[in-house]
Structure formats: C-alpha cells, structure tokens
Amino acid sequence: MVPRLLEYIMNNIKLTTRKTHKEKMLGRMVGISNAMRAAHIDIRKMLFRSVLAEFGGKMRMIACGGAELDSRVFNYLDDLGFNIYQGYGLTETAPILTIRGMFVKSKAGVGRPLRDVRLKIDKPNEMGEGEIVVKAPQVMIGYYHDKKATNEVLRNGWFYTGDLGRIRKDGNLEVVGRKKNVIVASNGKNIYPEELETLINYSDLVRESVVSGMKKGSGIQIVATIVLEDKYKNCSTVDSEIEKLIEEINANLPEYKRINKYVIRQDEFRKTTTMKIKRGSK
C-alpha cells in the first residue's frame, strides 16, 4: 500500500469521529491505551475493535512502500492498532532493502537494513545527508542492453539509488528526498521538496502538492502548487485558510526553507502506476 492511501484512511477516521462528536473520546482512549502500552500491556485490538472492524476485523498488517510514510500518519494509525510495516527499496533491488515495524519499533524512518544488505551514505553533508548506496545479493546485475545506464548506478559493486538520506541515531534509515529534486538555496543549503510537501499535505484542506524552486533575481523562490480536496474547492474562505497554513509551516522552518508563494491548481497532477506525482508534468 502506498502512503497516500494510509493518509486517506487516517483522514477518513478523523472526519468520521468529528462528524459523530467522538473525537475527544477517541483521544482519551488513545491516552489510556498508550499508558497501558508503556507498561507492556497492549489493549488496542480490544479498545479500537469498532474502528478495525471497518477494515474486515481480521487485518493482521499493512505493508507500506513506494515512498516514506509521514511519521504522524504512522503514529496515528499505530495508536489505533494498525500494524504497519514500512519498507524501503527500488525495482533494481528486488525490491526491499530496509523494513520498519516487524522487528524495529521506531516510529520514524524506513527501518534498518535486512540481513546481508550493506548500506551507507555517500558524501554526507554537515547534517549527515547524502546519497543512499547499497550492496546486497538482491541488487540487479544491470539494465537490459543498457551499459551506459548501468555504469551510472553501479560502481565498484555498489548501487547508487538516487535517493538522499541519513542514518538516525537509532540506526534507522531516513529518506529525505530524491537527488534530482533537490533545490539549492542561495546560501548553498539543500531544500528537499518532499519535506515541505509532507507538511502541506497533512492539512485536511489539501489533496496533494508539489514544491518547486523558481529563480527570482539572484535567489530562489520556493513555490507550492496545491490541489485542494473537492469539498473545499468552492469554499469562499479557502484562500485565507491556505495562507494561514503556509504561515504556520513557515514559522517552524529556517528562513531559507520557507515557502514564498503558493498557487492553487484545479486538476490533480499526473501520476505513475505507484501513485507518485510526475514532477514537471502539466
């Protein structure tokens, strides 16, 4: 399952509890459950059985991949008893390299490498961020009849993923974005569009968004193109609500990462078969 579907599930649960005036009650139940979990007593399946019953009542786990799942979505659903396993990998790695949830209980990142997977960060910056490179038995031997493309990603037995990430203190890999999507600010620091998009997409107003960098004078202007949820498209106050959202996001960001402008788009972005937005498409 791709992260966007889990976001949809979370938003629908929130909407239902809000409509039925059970939001506060659910919050209290989560508080009780988490206190019990801290004492190694898990009552989630019993406490939230009415929520889980909406998904058949027999769901053991959800495997999530295709992109990193927002930790807030993971935490929300985990609190309600959803067992989510987040994986990371590529088609070229057949397809999994790390996993979080099955043996690793961290609520951030995409987990630790599987057995026999060697993973490192190439040329890390001062934040420890660099390209994720791997060496493992499941890595492809090359692209069919394309030696040039093969040589670009396979070097000295290591596969260069094109993804940027860092290793957290708990040993989990955290993916911060795609190398080709990075926006370089005027101060030379990296801005990862995916990070800003996650913050924007967390709002109930927003269906999806794309953040890009546009030249303005000698600097870069950060622009967010936003697709609203259908029910808000004709809302008279939506512009002021989006402005407020951007202000709240910017308040917690360093100046070079702040969103300078937003554009509301009517049509959804074109997507790949794995529901990833095709950047640059109209």
Task: Give, region by region, the residue ranges found by the protein language model.
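Generic structural signal for well-ordered beta-strand positions
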Residues: 128, 168, 174, 191, ...
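Soluble, non-transmembrane catalytic domains of enzymes that act on hydrophobic metabolites at membranes
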Residues: 1-7, 12-14, 76-79, 101-102, ...
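Conserved C-terminal "lid"/linker of ANL adenylate-forming enzymes
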Residues: 210-213, 247-282
